Amino acid sequence: MNYFELFGLPIQFELDGSLLSSQFRALQKRFHPDNFATASERDRLMAVQQAAQINDAYQTLKDPLRRAEYLLSLQGIEMNAEQQTLQDPMFLMEQMELREELESVTACADPEAALVAFDTKVTAMQRHYLAQLQGQLAQSEWLAAADQIRKLKFIAKLKNEVERVEDQLLG
């Protein structure tokens, strides 16, 4: 049973977050190990394993990037173990320029405002790539979606760097 089936959801990128959360709570309640305290050792172990699978499935489905990777894995495309690199020189150049821009934020007259503006720009890029990914997955364009996921991973790392710089500025 795949994660979507576990939660009774259609196998697609777009999903109802509130339905996912309510299904998660219901499954958590149903398979909580405390409910099996008086059960046999085997049943208790199965409940713990089921609870772990439910938690893993929820964490995967609630995160758009992990959900997209999981959808590709259902199509036989494994992104986690891949050695494939992104073959988009324009995107890679843009990423280098963005990282240089982020490094220069701390030298600005108002670094906090510069960081907020930079983060706003990166968030807009992230939304743009997520929208493209959603369309590619809906059209079963698996290889294009895989490239989009690679791009989104770059952007996720950049967002982490923004948080690091923010911590430095506030620290």
Curated annotation (Swiss-Prot):
<keyword id="KW-0143">Chaperone</keyword>
<dbReference type="GO" id="GO:0044571">
    <property type="term" value="P:[2Fe-2S] cluster assembly"/>
</dbReference>
<dbReference type="InterPro" id="IPR009073">
    <property type="entry name" value="HscB_oligo_C"/>
</dbReference>
<dbReference type="InterPro" id="IPR001623">
    <property type="entry name" value="DnaJ_domain"/>
</dbReference>
<dbReference type="Pfam" id="PF00226">
    <property type="entry name" value="DnaJ"/>
</dbReference>
<dbReference type="GO" id="GO:0051087">
    <property type="term" value="F:protein-folding chaperone binding"/>
</dbReference>
<comment type="subunit">
    <text>Interacts with HscA and stimulates its ATPase activity.</text>
</comment>
<dbReference type="GO" id="GO:0051259">
    <property type="term" value="P:protein complex oligomerization"/>
</dbReference>
<dbReference type="GO" id="GO:0001671">
    <property type="term" value="F:ATPase activator activity"/>
</dbReference>
<dbReference type="Pfam" id="PF07743">
    <property type="entry name" value="HSCB_C"/>
</dbReference>
<comment type="similarity">
    <text>Belongs to the HscB family.</text>
</comment>
<dbReference type="InterPro" id="IPR036386">
    <property type="entry name" value="HscB_C_sf"/>
</dbReference>
<dbReference type="GO" id="GO:1990230">
    <property type="term" value="C:iron-sulfur cluster transfer complex"/>
</dbReference>
<protein>
    <recommendedName>
        <fullName>Co-chaperone protein HscB homolog</fullName>
    </recommendedName>
</protein>
<dbReference type="InterPro" id="IPR036869">
    <property type="entry name" value="J_dom_sf"/>
</dbReference>
<comment type="function">
    <text>Co-chaperone involved in the maturation of iron-sulfur cluster-containing proteins. Seems to help targeting proteins to be folded toward HscA.</text>
</comment>
<feature type="domain" description="J">
    <location>
        <begin position="2"/>
        <end position="74"/>
    </location>
</feature>
<dbReference type="GO" id="GO:0006457">
    <property type="term" value="P:protein folding"/>
</dbReference>
<dbReference type="InterPro" id="IPR004640">
    <property type="entry name" value="HscB"/>
</dbReference>
